[in-house]
Amino acid sequence: MNEKLEKMRNGKGFIAALDQSGGSTPKALKLYGVNENEYSNDKEMFDLIHKMRTRIIKSPAFNESKILGAILFEQTMDSKIDGKYTADFLWEEKKVLPFLKIDKGLNDLDADGVQTMKPNPTLADLLKRANERHIFGTKMRSVIKKASPAGIARVVEQQFEVAAQVVAAGLIPIIEPEVDINNVDKVQCEEILRDEIRKHLNALPETSNVMLKLTLPTVENLYEEFTKHPRVVRVVALSGGYSREKANDILSKNKGVIASFSRALTEGLSAQQTDEEFNKTLAASIDGIYEASVK
């Protein structure tokens, strides 16, 4: 664990988010050039997305020189690449740290303009399996659409409550309270969020290490203090609907923050490409995101 923690804390590179779940899979496949008439049920759909993820992970461009970690969906964790479970393949063949998406999706938007995470009664069992599958860390997402101090406080409190369970299971949690980039009051949301996160970080015991995954902030370096916080392993950014070019541009202006992009990583990849075209496109995408992460 120490070698892995050291890599995550100080390594150069970014985190590839490959954790599209049931809701976002059809969209991800469509962007990849696989239409909905090409599969007739969930199993076929997940087989196709696993093929896409396998193609990305096995690509020569996908390696530890630029990529520190990869976030997986539960079904991907239980699937294999060349006879090895995905997490083992990532670490043993690529020296890339495997993370697992552990949330069960979002509750509906509430009166405070936030979406907390759905209840997760089987979390303890999932964390046990994650350990058996050699997962390094976890990720869970909530969404903030309004500058409501009460709503944002609840989002952050829930995130840190679940993070404590993850830490107790011996894993590193990525706390992801996403601020919707279309918020009219995005700046206020982000300031309230920063203050809430600071409060919770300062209350963590010394044995707790967490990561933060945050929307690229409107105010440059808003989260810089967290990159130096003793309880924070790394601060990563989500692309949140910005184009890759725009996301990379904003990211490069935020010191100490690295990318954890999903859609921005796979932009331009297609099932119809030859391996040579696919690898070339992926390499260019990885290079751009890497440069913005290490700036």
UniProtKB/Swiss-Prot annotation:
The keyword Metal-binding does not apply. The active site is at residues 176, 213. Pfam families: Glycolytic. SUPFAM superfamilies: Aldolase (SSF51569). It comes from the Bacteria. It catalyses: beta-D-fructose 1,6-bisphosphate = D-glyceraldehyde 3-phosphate + dihydroxyacetone phosphate. Pathway: Carbohydrate degradation; glycolysis; D-glyceraldehyde 3-phosphate and glycerone phosphate from D-glucose: step 4/4. This is Fructose-bisphosphate aldolase class 1. It comes from Fusobacterium nucleatum subsp. nucleatum (strain ATCC 25586 / DSM 15643 / BCRC 10681 / CIP 101130 / JCM 8532 / KCTC 2640 / LMG 13131 / VPI 4355).
